[in-house]
Amino acid sequence: MRNYKLRLSVMSPSEWFHKLKNMTKPRKKHSLPLYSINTTKKRKPSSESKSLPYSSTSYFFNRSRSRTSFESRILQISPRNSLHNIQSKRKTVYKPSPPSSSIVSAGFNKTFHQSHDSLSASSNLKVISSEDDIIIDMNNRDFKKKTFKEITKFDSTEKACRASNRTKETHIPHHLSVKVSKEKEDEEEDACRTKKKHQKTLVSSGRRSSAKSPRIKLRARSPRIQVSPRRSKSRSQNKQILDSFAVIKSSIDPSKDFRESMVEMIAENNIRTSNDMEDLLVCYLTLNPKEYHDLIIKVFVQVWLEVINSTFASK
């Protein structure tokens, strides 16, 4: 029993030996990308991919296989092909900008011709567009006519605006009538201004004279003044008073001037009765402002007393 050795080969069957041999050899692990693992399940085995005879478990994929959608996207995004593809697939669709009324000037036609030449030169490019896009042929004659008509319209409006703002630069045949009407209006305005100035000078002169010295109406010699005198026995004396006219005098001492004028009126008209004296007083009160009424009454009383005293003395 000592010389007998127990071996594993005696216990295991002979069919397992080739498996044990293969277990000792390391398997070759091929690192595939993540996107290829997902595509291998869905992809059908092609006739081009052939398995090698000496390996029953390993499969090698051919590089010339069809590209999937994911790979094509990655290749499109690659920096080498991205610029080329984007430039080739860029849509060259030209749409005319709406004309703005605020940008109307003399240099507008030049800029339009330059932009039009650049557009016509670039119109030979290939256009890749969808059904919703609006494609405009810049070489079309109708389009050119429309654009040039619009530009001429803007030029005409510009000229009209300038003519309305500046009447001197216009060459319209009716400008003479406009000037004549303006001259007439200017003459009328000048006449109105002169009238107003004349009226202002008259009013101001009257105001200045009244401000310098108070004016007193001393004699009532105007028949237009409506005086309500009491009827006296001597109608001739009343008519003489009413037919007289008023004299306006600027005085420094109004009481003295009133006294002198009253004495003069009494002497000229030969006023002796009380009714005539009352009529004279009414004339002075109506012709002079209220400021002098108290002074007129005071002076009148003094003159009347003097007249009475003189009549008694003469008798």
Swiss-Prot record:
Predominant location: nucleus
Region (Disordered): 27-54, 159-238
Subcellular localization: Nucleus
Keyword Transcription regulation assigned: yes
Stretches assigned to the OVATE domain: 247-306
Bias-annotated ranges (Basic and acidic residues): 159-172
Keywords attached to this entry: Nucleus, Repressor, Transcription, Transcription regulation
Tissue: Expressed in root vascular cylinder, root tips, xylem of stems, flower buds and siliques.
Keyword Oxidoreductase set for record: no
Polar residues bias: start-end ranges: 201-212
A biological-process GO annotation: regulation of secondary cell wall biogenesis
Pfam families assigned to the protein according to its UniProt record, in alphabetical order: DNA_binding_2, Ovate
Disrupted-gene phenotype: Moderate irregular xylem, but normal plant morphology.
Residue ranges the record marks as coiled coil: none
Single annotated GO MF: DNA binding
GO cellular component: nucleus
Note: Plants over-expressing OFP4 show kidney-shaped cotyledons, round and curled leaves, small rosette size, late flowering, reduced fertilization and round seeds.
Function: Transcriptional repressor that regulates multiple aspects of plant growth and development through the regulation of BEL1-LIKE (BLH) and KNOX TALE (KNAT) homeodomain transcription factors. Forms a transcription repression complex with KNAT7 which regulates secondary cell wall formation.
Self-association and partners: Interacts with BLH1, BLH2, BLH3, BLH6, BLH10, KNAT1, KNAT3, KNAT4, KNAT5, KNAT6 and KNAT7.
Designated name of the protein: Transcription repressor OFP4
